[in-house]
Amino acid sequence: GADNFWHALLDGENGIRPIDLFDAHGLTVRFGGQVPSFDPKLYVRPRKSLKVMSRDIQFGFAAADLAMADAGVASERVDPERFGVVFGNDMIYADLDDLETTYRRAKTADGTFSYDQWSEAIQEELQPLWLLKHLPNMTASHIAIAQDARGPNNTIVLGDVSSLLAVSEAVSVIQRGWADIMLAGGTGSRLHPTALVARGNASLSKRGDDFESACRPFDLHRDGLVNGEGAAVLVLESREHAEKRGAQIRGRILATAACCEPRKQENLPAGRGVEMALRTVLKQAGLGTDNLGHINAHGLSTGPMDAAEAQAIAAVVGETPVTAPKSNFGHAGAGSGLMELAASVLAVESGTIPPTRNYETPDPACPIQVIHETPMEGRPRTAITVNFSTMGQASAVAITAD
C-alpha cells in the first residue's frame, strides 16, 4: 500500500533480491526487484478469476483494490456509467509450463518444428481460456468488472511510457466530460522467465555479487538496468466529484505531455523526446525552474540512456533536483511510470523528496543534481515525472500539492 511504499522510499530501502519465483540458476543474471510474499488471493475476487490472470494482471488488480481503499471510494456509491479504467501494460509472456507439452508434440522425429503438428496439438492441449492470461487489456477489464466501472475503458501498450500515457488518457476522459472518476494504472513484471530469455542480458547489470547496489541511476559506475516488477494505480477525479464526496485530495495534475524522437533502428534515443516532453508539460502547467520542486526521472541505470536523459533534463530545467526511484525497486516496465508518479504525488503531499539509492560518484555525462543519501525538504511542492523508451517515445506528467 501507499504508506509502506512511501516509508520504504524515504528510508532508502533496497528492493533488489535473488529471484526465487522460478529456478533461475540457468540465467546469467539471477537477481531483480521481485515483489516478496505476494498473495493474489488476498485481493482477487472471485477467486476463480486467478485461473485467467497472469502475474502482471494480478498486480494491477491488487493495486486497484488498494487505491480504491486509500481514496475512500466505495464503488457502489459511484455512478458506474461515469466510472472508468485506463491501464498501461506490457506485452505479457506465456508461461513455459502451459506450452511445453504442445511444443514437444510439434517436434518431428528429426528434431525440426512442424507447424501442422503445432496447430493440431494446440487445439487438444491448451485450455480454451488460455489466451486470456496474456492479453494486456485484461487488466483493465478485470478491474472494471470487479469495481463495476462501466465507463470508458482502455489499455495502452507502448513500452516504458505506457502508464504515464494512461494517466494522460484518463485525465482527457474526465476533461471531455465522459467520466467523473477514473482508475489510471500501470503494471508489469520483467521477471518472467520467458521475458528474461527473450530480452537477453546485454543491458542488465552484472553485479551478482553485490546486487543491492546494482541499480545506480546516473552514477558514474552504473553498468546496466535491474529488472523488476510491480504496479500502481491513481484514483483520478474531477474536483467537483472529489469535493462532493469529501475526498482527501493528495495532489492535482497540472498537465501531461507525449512526444516522440524519430530515430534510426541502430541508434538509441539522444534525449530529444525527453526534452520536448519536458518543455511541453512545463508550458502547459505554467511552471518554470523557479517553482518546480523536483524531477522524477526515468533513470534506467544504463550508460547511454541515463546520459541522454540527464542532458535533456539539464537543458530544460537546469539544476532542479532529480530523484530516480528505480534505484529502489528496479525496472518494472509499464508498471514503473505509475510507481514513480505515485512517489512524486506522495512527495508533493508531504513536502519531502525521497533520495536515489546507490548514487555515489557523479558522472560528467549526467550534469544533473541527483538527490541522494537523505531526503530533501524545502522545495516547491510541484513535480514532473518523465519516462521514455528505447524506441524514442517520451511522456511527462506535472503535478502539484492541492
Task: Label every PLM stretch briefly.
Residues 3-8, 92-111, 174-175, 196-209, ...:
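A glycine- and small-aliphatic-rich helix-loop capping segment at beta-alpha/alpha-beta transitions
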Residues 4-6, 10-147, 151-153, 188-196, ...:
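Conserved beta-ketoacyl condensing-enzyme motif
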Residues 13-17, 210-287, 293-294:
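Condensing-enzyme catalytic core mediating Claisen C-C bond formation in acyl metabolism
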Residues 21, 77-87, 154-158, 179-187, ...:
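Beta-strand segments within the central parallel beta-sheet cores of soluble alpha/beta enzyme folds
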Residues 60-73, 136-147, 153-188, 226-247, ...:
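Active-site-proximal alpha-helical scaffold in enzymes
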Residues 75-80, 285, 289-291, 366-402:
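Flexible, low-complexity linker/loop segments at domain and module junctions
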Residues 107-126, 168, 172, 176, ...:
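Glycine-/small-residue-rich "gating" segment that lines the acyl/pantetheine channel
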Residues 178-223, 256-269, 297-306, 320-369:
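Acyl-CoA/ACP chain-elongation machinery
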